[in-house]
């Protein structure tokens, strides 16, 4: 398990261009191009919910679920099998499993290569 440098960075912007692009503080960026599992936090009487999203084909009705700009990344790890786990303040959680044929996710940082 490998902890990533994006912990404690805030989400500046979330976009959909060639996948789900999460722009973070300090010129860091996560690009997800394979299906992800997004855990939504509980709200009011509604419990937490898991939603599978294909970042290359996000329907209009799922786009509001990706509205967590401003949230701080509280936990960022890569499991030994290549699974990316991201937790955000406010309760959102993203899990991206590896794909044998394509890069499922990429992490870029101006100061990290």
Segments from the language model and where they lie:
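Surface-exposed, interaction-prone regions used to assemble/regulate multi-protein complexes
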Residues: 1-113
């Amino acid at each position: 398990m490998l902890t990533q440098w994006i912990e404690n960075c805030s989400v500046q912007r979330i976009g959909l261009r060639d996948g789900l692009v999460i722009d973070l503080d300090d010129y860091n960026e996560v690009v997800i191009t394979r299906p992800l599992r997004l855990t939504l936090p509980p709200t009011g009487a509604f419990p937490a919910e898991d939603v599978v999203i294909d970042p290359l084909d996000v329907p209009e009705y799922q786009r509001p679920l990706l509205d967590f700009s401003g949230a701080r990344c509280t936990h960022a790890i890569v499991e030994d099998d290549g699974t990316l786990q991201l937790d955000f303040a406010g309760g959102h959680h993203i899990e991206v499993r590896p794909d044998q044929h394509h890069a499922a996710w990429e992490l870029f940082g101006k100061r990290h290569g």
